[in-house]
């Protein structure tokens, strides 16, 4: 039965109970969320965050669930998925996108406005919130290079506007991770450009992705961070791990840095593959592979 306090506090909000998160993650794995809500506005998100604090309910925030593994035991308390907060506005050379907006769609909006600077993100399957949270990047570009500010919501329900310096970006890191704040929106400072050149660069990067990455299978994208002085995929390839499989989770033959769902994988399968890859690379090369993918939830 639904937690009556959340039903009383939010009679107008659809609250899903014991909802399998495998329906929403890119890996198509993950256990249930006790309570799941898709907030549609900043106001609604703030009210839900404050409710969680006031009722001492564990709170988890999810974006597009593209670089995410949810363990098979699922997530206790309240989970918010922000994908319905997806407005994108263009103001001169600035693009302001809400946290749930897809990064791919944001790059398209920038292109249509004749703005250059976001081409590197073409094809990255995450949300704006997730991209800021982890300073997403590819092909020599990073979110930190184009974000001027982000509106965030603290776990105390306070809305702040953090500039680029305050976001303290690093390799796959931002201050949002340190304080577990909620990204509400981000502002990108771009430049006027030639629409044909912008489109050509986006198409080129999408072709590169398709040729190098196993896009035909469910996956969580790049699993490991790049260790200093090494290429992750090369290490995994040289360790002879491509094709290594546990259950339905497999180290991709196409790109060693990806773990794909070849059918019926569980999050436990994914974690077993990750741990085996880490142990093997450490033993063979003395290199520790840290996970880039966000791993949350409880063991089953």
Swiss-Prot record:
Principal cellular location given in the protein's record: cytoplasm
Lineage: Bacteria, Bacillati, Bacillota, Bacilli, Lactobacillales
Catalytic machinery residues: 172, 222, 292
Top EC group: oxidoreductase
Keywords, ordered alphabetically: Cell cycle, Cell division, Cell shape, Cell wall biogenesis/degradation, Cytoplasm, FAD, Flavoprotein, NADP, Oxidoreductase, Peptidoglycan synthesis
EC number(s) stated in the UniProt entry for this protein: 1.3.1.98
Domain named FAD-binding PCMH-type: residues: 29-193
Flavoprotein as UniProt keyword: yes
Family of the protein in this entry: Belongs to the MurB family.
UniProt-recorded name of the protein: UDP-N-acetylenolpyruvoylglucosamine reductase
GO molecular function (one): UDP-N-acetylmuramate dehydrogenase activity
């Amino acid at each position: 039965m639904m937690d009556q306090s959340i039903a009383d506090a939010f009679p107008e909000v659809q609250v899903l109970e014991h909802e399998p998160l495998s329906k929403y993650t890119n890996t198509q794995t993950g256990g249930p969320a006790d309570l799941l809500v898709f907030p549609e506005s900043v106001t609604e998100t703030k009210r839900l965050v404050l409710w969680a604090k006031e009722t001492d309910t564990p709170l988890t925030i999810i974006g597009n669930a593209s670089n995410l593994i949810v363990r098979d035991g699922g997530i206790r308390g309240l989970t918010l998925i922000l994908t319905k907060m997806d407005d994108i506005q263009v103001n001169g050379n600035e693009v302001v996108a809400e946290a749930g907006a897809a990064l791919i769609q944001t790059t398209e909006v920038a292109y249509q406005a004749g703005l250059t600077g976001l081409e590197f993100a073409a094809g990255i399957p995450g949300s704006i919130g997730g991209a800021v949270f982890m300073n997403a990047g590819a092909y020599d570009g990073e979110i930190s290079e184009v974000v001027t500010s982000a509106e965030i919501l603290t776990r105390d329900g306070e809305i702040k506007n953090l500039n680029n310096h305050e976001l303290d970006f690093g390799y796959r890191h931002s201050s949002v991770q340190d304080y577990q704040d909620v990204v509400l929106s981000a502002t990108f400072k771009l430049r006027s450009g030639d629409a044909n050149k912008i489109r050509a660069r986006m198409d080129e990067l999408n072709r590169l992705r398709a040729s190098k990455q196993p896009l035909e299978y469910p996956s969580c994208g790049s699993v490991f961070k790049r260790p200093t002085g090494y290429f992750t995929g090369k290490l995994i390839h040289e360790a002879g791990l491509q094709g290594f499989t546990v259950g339905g989770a497999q180290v991709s033959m196409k790109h060693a840095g990806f773990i794909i769902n070849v059918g019926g994988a569980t999050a436990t399968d994914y974690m077993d593959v990750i741990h085996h890859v880490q142990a093997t690379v450490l033993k063979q090369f003395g290199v520790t592979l840290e996970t880039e993918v966000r791993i949350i939830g409880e063991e089953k």
